[in-house]
Amino acid sequence: MANILKRWVESDKRTIRRLDKIANKVEAYADEYGKLSDADLQAKTPEFRERYKEGESLDDLLPEAFATAREGAKRVLGLYPFHVQILGGIVLHQGDIAEMKTGEGKTLTATMPVYLNAISGKGVHVVTVNEYLSARDATEMGELYNWLGMSVGINGAEKSPEEKRAAYNADITYSTNGEIGFDYLRDNMVVYREDMVQRPLNFAIIDEVDSILIDEARTPLIISGQSEGTTGMYKRADRFAKTLTKDEDYKVDLESKTVALLDEGIRKAEKYFGLENLYDTDNTALNHYLDEALRANYIMLKDKDYVISDGQALIVDSFTGRIMDGRRFSDGLHQAIEAKEHVEIQEETKTMANITYQNLFRMYKKLSGMTGTAKTEQEEFREIYNMEVITIPTNRPMIRDDRSDLLYPTLQSKFNAVVKEIKQLHEKGQPMLIGTVAVETSEYLSHRLDEENIPHVVLNAKNHAKEADIVANAGQRGAVTIATNMAGRGTDIKLGPGVKEVGGLAVIGTERHESRRIDNQLRGRAGRQGDPGMSQFYLSLEDDLMLRFGSERIKNFLQRMNVEDDDAVIQSRMITRQVESAQKRVEGNNYDSRKNVLQYDDVMRAQREVIYGERQQVIMEEKSLKPVIMPMIKRTVERTVQLHMQGDAKDWDLDAVVDFAQAAMVKEDSISVADLKGKSPAEVEAYLMDRVDKIYADKAKQLYDAGQMLEFEKVVILRVVDSHWTDHIDAMDQLRQSIGLRGYGQLNPLVEYQRDGYQMFEEMVADIDYDTTRLFMKSEIRQNIQR
């Protein structure tokens, strides 16, 4: 460990020496810019923008732009960034993480790289953990940016789409991580480009970067659609499907496991559901229910594909013949089977779109972050986000007294000691911040302090605005604040009058967190900006971390030292080392777990990029989507011909090709087997595509203008893509949950997931092609399509 620390320190020293040279260039402009009038300083912004347009890079502009922001901060905010803050700003501009201790002015540090990068006009996002901090920083720092001629937007959950669009179109946008993620997902669900709110993701500076990119890395952002109210539709579709006659109303293709309505079946469906045209784009949802009802009734076999047990439809694994507990068919097929068998139809909320923070933030062209604690996770930041963690020196030397851990045999004896310490420090008026890992612990400790008549405040994360006030007052003389898991990040604890004289803020940890980083955050609340302060952790052999790791060795150590008294205390570097080694093991496990999630999510990321890219192409198109639709139809035709016209001509199934053409492309009486006889597979494909071209031309004539045709094409493609994509997300989720079992068969679950996921994606693309073909070719176009 000592060697690793040494390497870190030496590597940082080299980096800081390199950054010092750039920072010195910034400081060299101080006198010159200090003499400029306000108007001349403000005129620098349009000058920089012009120079950027003419080819100067942001790196070229850095010294002057940083000097401008620095002088502006002095005039507008009354704050003048120190040399170390310039260093931090350069690290952020370079797309790395600036590790700056609490109280070193991270918010002011960010103003310089934010201003510099906003010059490009491509947008800068300042990302915070909650809306309170977002609004606070945007309001305070916004004064500086506005003065320098930059626009500032605040994004929030309550904002309307118009307000969000305005916020994202500003030069600088303040937002929470969650809201950026949900806006990204919603933008990829809209039908019209004017409904989108975001611009391409350009540059983000994440405040408390470890909290967002590590602690919340595994949290998926999910937009769910309500599928309630669909039970009735499954039942109606099922009742209709049961009235049909094989080969008269529908045709089954066992090879491809598909079932399609024939013209008579379509006519019956239109009569049954009271429709003019079953394949009108307004009936996409009904078509879905009908398709699933047909599959459930005429493809899926009871006691082969599924069994009914205790009023539930359970899937049978086709390989093992075993029941697959907890698994459900996706795409609504399971509900269709439940309707078929008259058992209770289980509603499901449907995932419409999802993404993890890991993959959201990796989409930015440039990403940077700042925090007081990131060095312990350096490897993860480098490997997953390609960001280095650079420790920025403090402006004043740190004099906080970090004491070795105190270890007690029992929880009871530990808390007795904690309460005793609080009493002693409270008597001399020294303010205290007491960190607990769990809410129950903070409530227990609060109860103990009530018994001792010690006034105190308990902090939980329910009210961010109030929380910030409580944390800000935690440095006043005599204040006692109990905080769970570092509530109040982002707010400085400033020392009140007379507090330095009694030793500054005392931080007391009531147990070690499983992450060293969280412990370091707690310690870091004391001793800001060269203030005095103290930190002390109290542990017991009954703490969670000690029970899980390393406790045996420590017990043996205590026995060797003949420690039998419950109130005995041990203060030893060996104890601290043991605890840190336990923490490192947990951190390693957590990192492996996050990396594992990312490897699985990367499969979805690649697929998401393809689908969202296609959606973007469709939404942004302004002339015609014929170049998109025609290849989809061509691929569908080719797949069908290849499936049914393989090998010798005597084995070809021309009836199946005709059935396909009638179901998905042309009027039923307009094509027969005679039209295809004597043709090679390539000639059949050419013949069918020729028919497609004619139908396309007819549709174009039916509409007033190209704009109407484009609108029709967009609606068809987007409805089909979105319907299949949401089903695919569900299917991939189910695959992900079940794939671990393959590990028992000596198969690599990740490789299996990648392979099956790719296959499912290919199948989905084929389904999208087919449904787009069917909807586009079979729809009757009404005049004047309404949005």
Swiss-Prot record:
HAMAP family: SecA
Keyword match Cell membrane: yes
Gene: secA
UniProt keyword list: ATP-binding, Cell membrane, Cytoplasm, Membrane, Nucleotide-binding, Protein transport, Translocase, Translocation, Transport
Topology class, membrane: Peripheral membrane protein
Residue sites binding ATP per the record: Q85, G103, E104, G105, K106, T107, D492
Subunit structure: Monomer and homodimer. Part of the essential Sec protein translocation apparatus which comprises SecA, SecYEG and auxiliary proteins SecDF. Other proteins may also be involved.
Annotated protein name in UniProt: Protein translocase subunit SecA
Assigned protein family: Belongs to the SecA family.
Biological process according to GO: intracellular protein transmembrane transport; protein import; protein targeting; protein transport by the Sec complex
EC number: 7.4.2.8
Source lineage: Bacteria, Bacillati, Bacillota, Bacilli, Lactobacillales
Gene3D superfamilies for this protein: Helical scaffold and wing domains of SecA, P-loop containing nucleotide triphosphate hydrolases, SecA, preprotein cross-linking domain
GO molecular function, one term: protein-exporting ATPase activity
Described function: Part of the Sec protein translocase complex. Interacts with the SecYEG preprotein conducting channel. Has a central role in coupling the hydrolysis of ATP to the transfer of proteins into and across the cell membrane, serving as an ATP-driven molecular motor driving the stepwise translocation of polypeptide chains across the membrane.
Catalytic activity from the UniProt record: ATP + H2O + cellular proteinSide 1 = ADP + phosphate + cellular proteinSide 2
Enzyme class: translocase
Signal peptide: none
